[in-house]
Amino acid sequence: MKPRLCFITNIGPHYRLPIFQKISETFSCDFYLGDHINTKIKTFDYNKLKGYKETLHNRFFHNFYWQNGSLQLVNKDYTHYILDGEPYCLSSWIILLWALIKHKETIAWTHGFYGNESFTKNIIKKVYYKLFTKLMVYSEYSISVMKSKGFNPKKMYCIANSLDSAHLLDIRKRLCKSDLYSKHFNNNYPVVIYCGRIQKRKQLNQIIDSAKMLYEENCPINVIFVGKDVDRVDIPCYAKAKGIEQNVWMYGPCYEDSTLAELFYNASVCVSPGNIGLTAIHALSFGCPIITHNNFAEQMPEFESIKPSKTGYFYQQGDIADLKDKIRKVISADEKTREEIREEAFKEIDKKWNIDYQINVLKKVLENE
């Protein structure tokens, strides 16, 4: 019997519309999407999704929430249910138990374990994930953590993550070098780019500290920050105190992929001292290597796209001298090596961090009953 999928998720983030559309085109799948979560996030227009059926109202109780109208979906003629894999969603616990009784398949699309869970959270997660038939986990790292906790590896699949793969590939084919940085900075120094919200937890001052150290070593760089300051971090003030304000460009937020492509392609390296998330996919899609910290328990799954010496580097978390050394290693590459790095970046995206890869994983999950 051909699988009939029911996809229940807490919200429809803007970046997931392309993968949801592809799922809708490839499988018989209906989508039930939550109306809001407690953190501000940009959503897509649900009516644009071919398989969209209904918006579910999320009722929050502190960190926990209940999706009104989700339980009745178990009584419909779906064969498989794809859930977020969030233990905080109380209604999903009931759906899992009910589906178990009705002999229906359940699939988690989840971060799984980070490896730094408290004793209580560890127990709750173990019980919760054991209720699923299959687990689609964002990273191999999380799968390895779950294996160590007794989860059956045959029931786990690495789903990775993606952006609008076809769109980004089309932009990539038109990429070329430009002089936007030399025009802005009035020099030809290597450029470090950070792209994302400017928050205190991102520890962006470490980039300024590294730039100052490199300046003192007679290896000056420019730094561009692409994103909105949502935490009053005030990087310009910090850069001025370090005496390198003329080498810092506060670009502001940018959501246009073709503009981001030019910024990434012409930069030397993307640095994220905090965790690295979807920015990694954006950077590598446009040929820019990445540097981030090496504490994987505090990382987002996209850190796995970094292959040391090929698509970027990891530095010792909190060690600014090591971050500086890693930046220096990348910016010291000659043009031939820089071009090889671009090709490695493209190769990594084409291999795993794209929609086609995710669709193939979902096919395997549905085939291996």
What is each model feature region?
Residues 2, 226, 233-254:
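Nucleotide-activated donor-binding/catalytic signature segment of Leloir-type glycosyltransferases, i.e.
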Residues 262-275, 288-289:
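Acidic donor-binding loop of glycosyltransferase active sites
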Residues 104-123, 131-134:
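A short, histidine- and acid-enriched strand-loop-helix "catalytic/donor-clamping" loop
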Residues 289-298:
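Short hydrophobic beta-strand element within catalytic cores of glycosyltransferases
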Residues 132-179, 187, 194:
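Donor nucleotide-sugar binding/catalytic pocket of nucleotide-sugar-dependent glycosyltransferases
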Residues 6, 181-202, 208-211:
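Conserved donor-binding/catalytic core segment of Leloir-type glycosyltransferases
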Residues 332-366:
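A charged, aromatic-enriched C-terminal amphipathic alpha-helix characteristic of glycosyltransferases
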